[in-house]
Amino acid sequence: MKIVEVKHPLVKHKLGLMRENDISTKRFRELASEVGSLLTYVATADLETEKVTIEGWNGPVEIEQIKGKKITVVPILRAGLGMMEGVLENVPSARISVVGVYRDEETLKPVPYFQKLVSNIDERMALVVDPMLATGGSMIATIDLLKKAGCKSIKVLVLVAAPEGIKALEAAHPDVELYTASIDQGLNEHGYIIPGLGDAGDKIFGTK
């Protein structure tokens, strides 16, 4: 599995600000979007382009544009919505697919409860976004759904990832690509990432 830890200074700085315990909902939400945008820039670097001719200000001009069906952004509800705006800043024409998976806080197992995927997902690259890759269960369940629907190209974008989650994801889906702003220390006894960001969903939606 391709694993990319994006170590750009802007990513490091913004993620560092997100780790503050008393960060406001507004600021956390803004930073989640900004880091999501930067991760998207890196993750889409290998998109194929094609040359086309358009009418420029001084006559015909040859340009490059992304080839074929492009991208579907797949936020995992609910926290993934916090990164979606930043992703769409880079790929505004992307279609949106939504998957709902929550983690049972006692068993730590993923529980799928909703999915609404674009009809031609088999022709698109999926960018799956979720702030945290902890145990990997929710991400694996989401990718299971995408592959069942025919999706062949999948990239995962997360703000922070635990080694345990990376290992589980690689074992289940070695053909996907992972882009993260940080590979953190690991999980505590409750399955939360250390040092992590706390409960990203609560911080994004102001329910902490």
UniProtKB/Swiss-Prot annotation:
Known catalytic reactions: UMP + diphosphate = 5-phospho-alpha-D-ribose 1-diphosphate + uracil
Assigned EC number: 2.4.2.9
Pfam families linked to this entry: UPRTase (PF14681)
Enzyme's top EC category: transferase
SUPFAM superfamilies in alphabetical order: PRTase-like (SSF53271)
Keyword Magnesium: yes
Cofactor binding note from Swiss-Prot or TrEMBL: Binds 1 Mg(2+) ion per subunit. The magnesium is bound as Mg-PRPP.
Organism superkingdom: Bacteria
Gene Ontology terms describing biological process: UMP salvage; uracil salvage
Binding residues for 5-phospho-alpha-D-ribose 1-diphosphate: R78, R103, D130, P131, M132, L133, A134, T135, G136, G137, S138, D199
A GO MF term: GTP binding
Binding site for uracil: I193, G198, D199, A200
Cofactor: Mg(2+)
Sorted UniProt keywords: Allosteric enzyme, Glycosyltransferase, GTP-binding, Magnesium, Nucleotide-binding, Transferase
Protein's UniProt keywords contain Transferase: yes
InterPro entries assigned: PRibTrfase_dom, PRTase-like, Upp_B, UPRTase/APRTase, Ura_phspho_trans
Protein family per UniProt: Belongs to the UPRTase family.
Function: Catalyzes the conversion of uracil and 5-phospho-alpha-D-ribose 1-diphosphate (PRPP) to UMP and diphosphate.
Protein name, UniProt field: Uracil phosphoribosyltransferase
UniProt organism field: Yersinia enterocolitica serotype O:8 / biotype 1B (strain NCTC 13174 / 8081)
Gene: upp
